[in-house]
């Protein structure tokens, strides 16, 4: 629940978010809001996301209202590809939470860390509800900033024994290898085709605009969490793979327009009705995986309600701990 403004504007910085919100808190918040969305108790507003034709940046807004949790707000931010050269994260964002009873700005929360951990929580929720319980090999496609968050969150969902990984820049793979070693998991850098042959669960977390995985490379029973496609034109996997899989998503409206399903839907090979909100599985309204041979795919487009959910948790914990700043507007 968003804090009230009677004591001024609450400000929770990036450092506090990292101290207060862990993987368990993020998982619970994201799973809860996905369930609320499927019940119709929470909804996202239309996304605004634009190439601003400056610094090669993408900038936009994601917002929504969770009536069940009484969380109202907006995340503002985007992607600046040159930031890492200046020691900054390429992803930059801030979350604004409003008092739903009055409309007053209540809380300002740093969104960079929370974006990474809520994205990882989303794929983790999909793994928990859709992957085979006997999954042993985790495949990672992408080794950027968010990849280590993804690996840590995924590793908590199944008894994985090995991580296989591919990245277009193989010199970045050691960051994943270090985390795998820390978690006691065998690590192997492989080709894309070999990754598909070995992995029981695959996470794609890239900014690709062409398929990195082809349908014929994926073995029966695999669960894929496609987490990088959040803009029109982006694509991480072959559209034929999307068509052959049982597809779940965070938000169907986004999946078919800016998500991994956009290409299959755009060609007429997949209908909107064939895509299921993962909240329906969480709520027990859909069985999820139907067999050990079924290929399941989670199209994680990233919705504003995820950001608001984890930001609300950060605000509550910071207020309880007395570690947030308060200012009067």
Where do the language-model regions lie?
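Conserved beta-strand elements of the Class I
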Residues: 138-139, 296
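NAD(P)-binding Rossmann-fold cofactor-contacting core
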Residues: 156-183
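Residues in the short beta-alpha loop(s) of Rossmann-like NAD(P)-binding domains
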Residues: 144, 168-169, 230
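Adenosine-phosphate binding glycine-rich loop
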Residues: 14-17, 235-329
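Short internal alpha-helix immediately C-terminal to a glycine-rich phosphate-binding loop
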Residues: 118-138, 145-157
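Rossmann-like adenosine-cofactor binding region
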Residues: 185-269
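N-terminal ligand-binding/catalytic initiation module
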Residues: 1-115, 124, 134, 305-308, ...
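Nucleotide donor/acceptor-binding cores
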Residues: 134-136, 161, 222
């Amino acid at each position: 629940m968003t804090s009230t403004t009677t004591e001024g504007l609450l400000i929770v910085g990036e450092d506090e978010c990292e101290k207060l919100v862990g993987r368990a808190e993020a998982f619970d918040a994201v799973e809860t809001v996905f369930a609320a969305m499927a019940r119709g108790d929470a909804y996202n507003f239309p996304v605004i996301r634009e190439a601003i034709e400056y610094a090669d940046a993408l900038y936009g807004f994601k917002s929504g209202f969770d009536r069940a949790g009484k969380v109202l707000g907006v995340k503002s931010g985007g992607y600046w590809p040159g930031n890492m050269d200046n020691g900054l994260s390429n992803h930059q964002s801030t979350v604004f939470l409003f008092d739903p009873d009055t409309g007053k700005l209540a809380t300002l929360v740093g969104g960079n860390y929370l974006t990474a951990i809520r994205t990882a929580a989303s794929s983790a929720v999909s793994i928990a509800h859709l992957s085979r319980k006997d999954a042993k090999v985790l495949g990672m496609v992408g080794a950027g900033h968010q990849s280590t968050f993804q690996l840590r969150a995924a590793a908590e969902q199944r008894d994985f024994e090995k991580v296989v990984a591919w990245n277009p820049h193989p010199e970045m793979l050691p960051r994943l290898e270090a985390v795998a070693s820390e978690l006691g998991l065998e690590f192997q850098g492989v080709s894309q085709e070999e990754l598909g042959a070995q992995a029981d669960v695959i996470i794609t977390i890239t900014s690709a605009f062409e398929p990195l995985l082809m349908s014929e490379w994926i073995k029966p029973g695999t669960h894929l969490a496609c987490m990088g496609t959040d803009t029109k034109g982006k694509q991480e996997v072959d559209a034929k793979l999307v068509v052959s899989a049982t597809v779940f998503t965070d938000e169907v409206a986004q999946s078919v327009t800016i998500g991994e399903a956009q290409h299959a839907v755009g060609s007429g090979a997949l209908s909107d009705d064939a895509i299921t909100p993962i909240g329906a599985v969480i709520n027990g309204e859909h069985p999820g995986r139907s067999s050990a041979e079924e290929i399941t795919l989670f199209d994680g487009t990233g919705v504003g309600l995820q950001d608001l959910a984890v930001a609300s948790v950060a605000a509550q914990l910071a207020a309880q701990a007395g570690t947030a700043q308060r200012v009067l507007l």
